Amino acid sequence: MEENIDLPIDIDQKKTAQKVRDFFKFNFEHYLIRAGYHRTDLSSPQLDPTGIMSHGGNSAENKMATIFEAQDKCQAVYHAIEQCADSSKQPFRTILKSLYIEELTDWQVAAKVQYSDSRYSDLKRYALCQFADTIDTWKTIYNVKIPELKLFKNRVNIGERSD
């Protein structure tokens, strides 16, 4: 039985969750490397999202603009995680931070949130779907291009082939 977590009714939770897992594995890793960040930098208070972008034509300025953009993408991801629900019944923020910032394993996170493996799997899927929804706000705030992560039932999705 699918649990309502305030997502669009026609979202394909399994496909969306897989797309978000892939995003964290590939895109987010790339953003961190490009930004010169370590995952622990995202949870530390000294991080300063200035949003300063240089628009000159010089090569050094272009490289800095690329770095600033990657830093803004990392900030958007972090804030999207922070915006996710975090209660005893919906520990979505805890799950996402534990997996993708602290790099804990699934079994460690399941123990941390004190749920059985099967219930944890459901909660993880819901957390990934909620992240897919919240990232839209933060990519607008930071004015960055981050791929669409939500996939829908009975629709042709952006970035997917139709059969």
Residue ranges and their predicted role:
Residues M1-A85, D136-D163:
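N-terminal interaction/assembly modules
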Residues P49, S54-H55, Y115-S118, Y126:
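C-terminal low-complexity, acidic/polar tails when present
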Residues K73-V77, P91-F92, L123:
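Amphipathic alpha-helical interface surfaces
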Residues E82, K97-I101, A132:
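Short, locally clustered residues in the helix-turn-helix/winged-helix DNA-binding domain
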Residues C84-S87, Y115:
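Short acidic, glycine/proline-enriched loop segments that cap or flank alpha-helices
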Residues S87-L104:
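Short amphipathic alpha helix immediately N-terminal
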Residues E102-R119:
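Helix-turn-helix DNA-binding module
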Residues Y120-W138:
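DNA major-groove recognition helices of helix-turn-helix
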